[in-house]
Protein backbone atom coordinates (compact mmCIF):
# COMPACT_ATOMS: atom_id res chain seq x y z
CA UNK A 1 0.00 0.00 0.00
CA UNK A 2 1.27 3.49 -0.83
CA UNK A 3 0.69 6.25 1.70
CA UNK A 4 1.37 9.94 1.12
CA UNK A 5 2.01 11.95 4.27
CA UNK A 6 0.61 15.42 4.93
CA UNK A 7 2.65 18.20 6.56
CA UNK A 8 1.32 17.46 10.04
CA UNK A 9 2.16 13.76 9.70
CA UNK A 10 -1.41 12.55 9.22
CA UNK A 11 -1.46 9.90 6.45
CA UNK A 12 -4.05 10.92 3.89
CA UNK A 13 -4.02 9.19 0.51
CA UNK A 14 -3.51 5.47 -0.05
CA UNK A 15 -3.64 3.22 -3.07
CA UNK A 16 -5.76 0.24 -2.11
CA UNK A 17 -4.07 -3.10 -2.83
CA UNK A 18 -5.94 -5.68 -4.86
CA UNK A 19 -7.72 -8.22 -2.75
CA UNK A 20 -9.37 -7.39 0.55
CA UNK A 21 -11.29 -4.11 0.54
CA UNK A 22 -11.18 -1.83 3.55
CA UNK A 23 -14.30 -0.67 5.40
CA UNK A 24 -15.03 3.05 5.63
CA UNK A 25 -14.98 4.46 9.18
CA UNK A 26 -17.59 7.04 8.17
CA UNK A 27 -20.32 4.95 6.53
CA UNK A 28 -19.19 1.38 7.39
CA UNK A 29 -19.45 0.32 3.73
CA UNK A 30 -16.61 -1.31 1.81
CA UNK A 31 -14.33 1.07 -0.05
CA UNK A 32 -14.35 -0.09 -3.65
CA UNK A 33 -12.51 2.93 -5.02
CA UNK A 34 -8.88 2.64 -6.03
CA UNK A 35 -7.98 5.53 -3.70
CA UNK A 36 -8.93 5.76 -0.06
CA UNK A 37 -8.08 8.11 2.74
CA UNK A 38 -6.47 7.19 6.02
CA UNK A 39 -6.81 9.32 9.15
CA UNK A 40 -6.57 8.28 12.82
CA UNK A 41 -5.56 4.80 11.62
CA UNK A 42 -8.95 4.38 9.93
CA UNK A 43 -9.91 4.32 6.26
CA UNK A 44 -12.44 6.64 4.64
CA UNK A 45 -14.23 7.31 1.34
CA UNK A 46 -13.36 10.76 -0.01
CA UNK A 47 -16.91 11.95 0.72
CA UNK A 48 -17.01 10.46 4.23
CA UNK A 49 -13.97 12.18 5.73
CA UNK A 50 -15.55 15.30 7.22
CA UNK A 51 -14.95 17.81 9.99
CA UNK A 52 -16.63 16.65 13.20
CA UNK A 53 -17.97 20.18 13.83
CA UNK A 54 -19.05 21.71 10.52
CA UNK A 55 -19.24 18.62 8.24
CA UNK A 56 -17.05 20.20 5.55
CA UNK A 57 -15.31 17.65 3.32
CA UNK A 58 -11.67 17.01 4.16
CA UNK A 59 -11.05 14.40 1.49
CA UNK A 60 -10.36 16.85 -1.32
CA UNK A 61 -6.80 17.21 -2.59
CA UNK A 62 -5.09 20.04 -0.77
CA UNK A 63 -7.35 19.86 2.29
CA UNK A 64 -5.65 19.83 5.65
CA UNK A 65 -7.13 18.10 8.61
CA UNK A 66 -6.32 18.37 12.27
CA UNK A 67 -6.86 15.77 14.97
CA UNK A 68 -7.15 16.26 18.69
CA UNK A 69 -9.10 14.40 21.37
CA UNK A 70 -9.99 11.77 18.74
CA UNK A 71 -11.79 14.40 16.65
CA UNK A 72 -11.13 15.10 12.99
CA UNK A 73 -11.41 18.84 12.34
CA UNK A 74 -10.92 21.42 9.62
CA UNK A 75 -8.42 24.20 10.29
CA UNK A 76 -11.10 26.77 11.20
CA UNK A 77 -12.80 24.55 13.79
CA UNK A 78 -9.49 23.32 15.21
CA UNK A 79 -8.39 26.91 15.84
CA UNK A 80 -11.83 27.82 17.18
CA UNK A 81 -11.76 24.95 19.68
CA UNK A 82 -8.08 24.65 20.57
CA UNK A 83 -6.26 27.69 19.21
CA UNK A 84 -5.30 30.88 20.98
CA UNK A 85 -4.75 34.45 19.85
CA UNK A 86 -2.08 35.05 22.47
CA UNK A 87 -2.12 36.47 25.96
CA UNK A 88 -4.23 39.34 27.24
CA UNK A 89 -2.05 42.41 27.82
CA UNK A 90 -3.94 43.23 31.04
CA UNK A 91 -4.35 39.88 32.84
CA UNK A 92 -1.74 37.79 30.95
CA UNK A 93 -4.18 34.86 30.54
CA UNK A 94 -4.54 33.03 27.22
CA UNK A 95 -7.23 34.27 24.85
CA UNK A 96 -9.02 31.48 22.93
CA UNK A 97 -9.06 31.99 19.16
CA UNK A 98 -12.88 32.14 19.06
CA UNK A 99 -13.19 34.87 21.71
CA UNK A 100 -13.93 38.48 20.79
CA UNK A 101 -11.07 40.82 21.67
CA UNK A 102 -10.16 44.49 21.80
CA UNK A 103 -6.87 45.71 20.35
CA UNK A 104 -4.70 48.73 21.06
CA UNK A 105 -1.60 48.90 18.89
CA UNK A 106 0.12 45.51 19.30
CA UNK A 107 -1.77 44.64 22.49
CA UNK A 108 -4.75 42.27 22.62
CA UNK A 109 -7.28 42.25 25.48
CA UNK A 110 -10.25 40.20 26.67
CA UNK A 111 -13.38 42.35 26.41
CA UNK A 112 -13.69 42.31 30.21
CA UNK A 113 -10.06 43.40 30.63
CA UNK A 114 -10.27 46.35 28.23
CA UNK A 115 -10.66 49.04 30.89
CA UNK A 116 -8.85 52.03 32.33
CA UNK A 117 -6.05 50.62 34.43
CA UNK A 118 -6.38 53.37 37.03
CA UNK A 119 -10.15 53.62 37.65
CA UNK A 120 -11.31 50.33 36.00
CA UNK A 121 -13.86 52.09 33.74
CA UNK A 122 -14.65 49.63 30.93
CA UNK A 123 -14.46 50.81 27.33
CA UNK A 124 -16.88 50.02 24.53
CA UNK A 125 -16.18 49.98 20.80
CA UNK A 126 -15.76 53.59 19.68
CA UNK A 127 -14.89 54.97 23.13
CA UNK A 128 -11.87 57.26 23.30
CA UNK A 129 -8.97 55.89 25.30
CA UNK A 130 -5.30 56.67 25.73
CA UNK A 131 -2.32 54.33 25.73
CA UNK A 132 0.66 55.43 27.78
CA UNK A 133 3.54 53.14 28.76
CA UNK A 134 1.34 50.16 27.75
CA UNK A 135 -1.34 51.33 30.19
CA UNK A 136 -4.88 51.93 28.93
CA UNK A 137 -6.34 55.11 30.40
CA UNK A 138 -9.74 56.79 30.23
CA UNK A 139 -9.85 60.43 29.14
CA UNK A 140 -10.32 61.76 32.69
CA UNK A 141 -7.32 59.87 34.12
CA UNK A 142 -5.19 60.74 31.10
CA UNK A 143 -6.04 64.46 31.33
CA UNK A 144 -5.34 64.43 35.06
CA UNK A 145 -1.93 62.90 34.33
CA UNK A 146 -1.33 65.56 31.66
CA UNK A 147 -2.13 68.34 34.15
CA UNK A 148 0.30 66.79 36.63
CA UNK A 149 2.91 66.55 33.86
CA UNK A 150 2.95 62.73 34.05
CA UNK A 151 2.08 61.87 30.43
CA UNK A 152 2.97 62.76 26.86
CA UNK A 153 0.16 62.69 24.29
CA UNK A 154 -0.47 59.26 22.73
CA UNK A 155 -4.13 59.36 21.71
CA UNK A 156 -5.60 56.14 20.23
UniProtKB/Swiss-Prot annotation:
It is found in: Nucleus. Signal peptide: none annotated. Its main location: nucleus. Coiled coil: none annotated. Gene3D superfamilies: Cysteine Rich Protein. Keywords: LIM domain, Metal-binding, Nucleus, Repeat, Zinc. GO terms for molecular function: DNA-binding transcription factor binding; metal ion binding; transcription coactivator activity. GO terms for biological process: positive regulation of transcription by RNA polymerase II. It holds the Pfam family LIM. The keyword Kinase does not apply. Residues 22-84, 86-148 form the LIM zinc-binding domain. One of its GO terms (cellular component) is nucleus. May be involved in gene regulation within neural lineage cells potentially by direct DNA binding or by binding to other transcription factors. This is Rhombotin-1. It comes from Xenopus laevis (African clawed frog). The gene is lmo1.
Amino acid sequence: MMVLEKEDGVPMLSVQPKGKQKGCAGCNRKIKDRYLLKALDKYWHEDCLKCACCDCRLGEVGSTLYTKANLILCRRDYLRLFGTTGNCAACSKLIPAFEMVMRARDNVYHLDCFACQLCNQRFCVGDKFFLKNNMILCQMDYEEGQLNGSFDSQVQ
